[in-house]
């Protein structure tokens, strides 16, 4: 092959940087050449529309994940608060009952009921 032998010679083969410059300059010319063509603009509008849809999907997905985390965290904190409240109220009721039993602060008919309930005493 006469062309292959000529261009395979070291002095005639361009180096990587020169080939990169040539390729990018040719590509840029092609881009500018086709930039105002109707099919190119339509294609760009479709791509922009697809990017917009993908962005909205991503945002919707991530915002729903953060909303679920917020809801889950809020429920957990609410349950924790109510649990502590009921436990502390139960403890407070037990202490109050013990104090009133010691000081005979209950009417006599209540004493029977309270003394039978060992959890409060």
Swiss-Prot record:
User: Does this entry carry the keyword GTP-binding?
Assistant: no
Principal location: plastid
- Annotated protein name in UniProt: Protein Ycf2
Q: Which gene encodes it?
A: ycf2
Q: Name one GO cellular component term.
A: chloroplast stroma
Per the record, the similarity remark reads: Belongs to the Ycf2 family.
- What molecular function terms (GO) are annotated for this protein? ATP binding
What role is this protein assigned? Probable ATPase of unknown function. Its presence in a non-photosynthetic plant (Epifagus virginiana) and experiments in tobacco indicate that it has an essential function which is probably not related to photosynthesis.
List the subcellular locations: Plastid, Chloroplast stroma
Keywords, sorted A to Z: ATP-binding, Chloroplast, Nucleotide-binding, Plastid
């Amino acid at each position: 092959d006469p062309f292959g032998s000529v261009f395979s010679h070291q002095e005639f083969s361009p180096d990587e940087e020169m080939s990169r410059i040539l390729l990018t300059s040719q590509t840029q010319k092609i881009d500018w050449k086709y930039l105002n063509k109707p099919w190119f603009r339509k294609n760009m509008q479709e791509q922009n529309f697809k990017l917009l849809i993908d962005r909205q999907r991503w945002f919707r997905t991530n915002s729903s994940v953060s909303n679920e985390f917020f809801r889950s965290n809020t429920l957990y904190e609410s349950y924790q608060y109510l649990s502590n409240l009921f436990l502390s109220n139960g403890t407070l009721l037990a202490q109050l009952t013990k104090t009133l039993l010691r000081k005979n602060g209950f009417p006599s008919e209540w004493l029977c009921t309270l003394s039978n309930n060992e959890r409060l005493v």
